[in-house]
Amino acid sequence: MKRLLLSFLFVIAFGSCAFEEGEDELCFVGDSITYLWDLEYYFPNYIVSKHAVSGAGLKQMDSWDVSDCKGRTTILLIGTNDIGYWKSTADGIEHLREEYKDRFIKSAKRIEASPLIVLSILPRNAWGEQDPAVNENIEIQNEILKRALKTEIPGSRFVDVFDMFLDSGFEIREDLFKDGLHPNDEGYEILSQKIQGGL
């Protein structure tokens, strides 16, 4: 019932820019957050391709055949499995962030999307066991990726949803997650709305 109500509100709020039948195709690339995303439900008027594996990071993504995303609008959401345990206080963290930025840009370019839409890495508290310093680092990494995408992949878009999933003190909004890592229906509704706003 809650999901039906959310869908109704989604239509009311965004009906003026609703998708048109056969308007376009979308390609989604990511980890378990994308894998669990019911894309056919949230984007019913699009032809959707999904490349997503639970536990995946950039290394795994680089081995995938994403040639069907070339020249297509592609939404990339990945990174939590790569940097989800890095704390802002860790030794050498600045070097790690720069190195990760370079790897991320290289992997994103390989998709050859047009345009590429990158969703920010979400805050997390996997199974209620993580230090909020992890989210402080994710926030900084997102800003680094945002700046790099602007210069390294012209025409790409960075959709920042980090703050929408964050509570005070770098704690996550528990009401938007199932397990501190994967969004629940309300969380996926937010992601879908933000993507629609960027199309």
Language-model region placement:
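Positively charged n-region of N-terminal signal peptides that target proteins for export
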Residues: 1-4
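Serine-esterase "nucleophile elbow" of acetyl-processing enzymes
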Residues: 7, 16-75
